[in-house]
Amino acid sequence: MHKLTPDEAIDIAYDIFLEMAGEHLEPADILLFNLQFEERGAVEMVETSDRWEEEIGTLIDPTAFAEVWVGLVNDKDEMDDVFARFLISHQAENREYHVIWKE
């Protein structure tokens, strides 16, 4: 199985984020993201958490998925405002994904 590269995972997550953010985020969060993204925005692939089962109610194999966060970083370059967390399958022919949106 070909695993997604960080760039591929980031591109997929960001495309989904742009397409769906308007339906899932508060207008104030969308405005904040749009105003701050150029200066503080980040889309990062992180180590796949083993806690997704608690989030989505399905047991997953962390090695079969990439996890990507979309948000804003602080002055220490830490993502302190996460707008969406993505779990994206490495399988290209059956690209499954899950999103946890900021509440």
Swiss-Prot record:
Q: Which InterPro entries match?
A: dsDNA_mimic_put, Put_dsDNA_mimic_sf
Can you tell me which family this protein belongs to? Belongs to the putative dsDNA mimic protein family.
> What is the stated purpose of this protein?
May act as a double-stranded DNA (dsDNA) mimic. Probably regulates the activity of a dsDNA-binding protein.
Q: Name one Pfam family in it.
A: DUF440
Q: What is this protein called?
A: Putative double-stranded DNA mimic protein HD_0986
SUPFAM superfamilies registered for this protein in UniProt: Putative dsDNA mimic
